[in-house]
Amino acid sequence: CTLALYAEGDLCGRHEIVARAHNRHILGMLSAILGGRALADAVDIIACGIGPGSFTGLRVAVSVAQGLAWSQDMPVHGFCSLEAQAHTAGHQGLLREGDRVLSAIDAQIDQFYGLWGDWRGGAFATDGEAFVCAPEGLLAESSCPATIVIGSGARYQERMPSDLISTARSLPDVTPDARVMAEL
């Protein structure tokens, strides 16, 4: 579960691994981040991950974002979880200039959600659309093999076609972080 507030150059946020417990943590995390301030005084726009990812986690995130936005007459902006994950890895210093990135999230059904892209100039540039596939069914969006596989879907790397990932570094513990997305 990850939340962030970016206001007037100040960033505060929380990022906690709470598998299957987002609904019990998200509002408490929001309250802690607001620190007693009214939502309307602290926020101009609400953004949330819109997938792909855990169906329940996405429902919680989108429901809370929509409910808060509706109650305060604020706009909502959605962002791709796979892009957020890649930006997080890059801003944590885990990606190198020119890395060919496969951002992957375990779909929990012997498949993964994936998105190809490149790390250039301090940003993740996507190459194609997000997809879901079995590890053995992975197709390259270009002729360039991955130099790094990030996210929980990296656990399938041994089953992915070797011509696409054989020399790729693996970072399975990277997850999207709202603090990074708030700064973008």
Q: What feature does the model see in each segment?
A:
Residues 33-37, 71, 89, 181-184:
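Stable alpha-helical structural segments in soluble proteins, enriched in small hydrophobic residues
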Residues 47-81:
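DPxDG-like acidic metal-binding loop motif
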Residues 23-24, 176-183:
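Short, charged, surface-exposed secondary-structure boundary motifs
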Residues 10-11, 15-21, 75-176:
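Surface "functional belts" at beta-alpha junctions
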Residues 1-52:
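N-terminal beta-alpha supersecondary unit
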Residues 43-49, 57, 100-104:
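Short glycine-aspartate micro-motif
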